[in-house]
């Protein structure tokens, strides 16, 4: 929830693109003195990065997944259960509306733009010399 709050606050500050809002949220959490806020940002980054990895290389995703600590696995499972509730016809319609809304507002990737924050994460860590 903390990373979502930071994401929405970044929109209020004028960053309308979803990938930018996610990345700003990650940075805000990453730079926080609050352990829970840092964890929330790390989880958001992990979810987006591993979702993208799964699309491109399910075997690499599985390798990484087996290395995650039990507490992280529990939190990921809870996150999946939460979002599973919205996999309904109404939820799918809302996703289509959100996709159309984003595209109408010059975010040509629509809902796919949320995950593009992974590109920004990679650039950030490259600039830091960490990858």
Predicted regions and their residues:
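Post-HEXXH active-site segment of zinc metalloproteases
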Residues: 17-44
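Sec-exported extracytoplasmic/periplasmic mature domains
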Residues: 10, 14, 26-33, 51-58
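Acidic/histidine-rich catalytic neighborhood
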Residues: 42-67
């Amino acid at each position: 929830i903390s990373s979502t709050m930071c994401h929405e606050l970044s929109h209020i500050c004028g960053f309308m693109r979803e990938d930018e809002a996610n990345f700003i949220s990650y940075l805000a959490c990453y730079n926080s003195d609050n352990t829970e806020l840092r964890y929330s940002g790390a989880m958001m980054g992990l979810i987006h990065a591993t979702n993208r990895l799964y699309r491109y290389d399910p075997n690499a995703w599985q390798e990484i997944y087996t290395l995650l600590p039990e507490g992280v696995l529990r939190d990921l499972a809870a996150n999946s259960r939460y979002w599973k509730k919205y996999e309904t016809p109404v939820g799918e319609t809302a996703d289509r509306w959100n996709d159309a809304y984003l595209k109408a507002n010059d975010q040509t990737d629509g809902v796919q733009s949320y995950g593009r924050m992974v590109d920004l994460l990679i650039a950030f860590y490259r600039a830091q010399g960490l990858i």
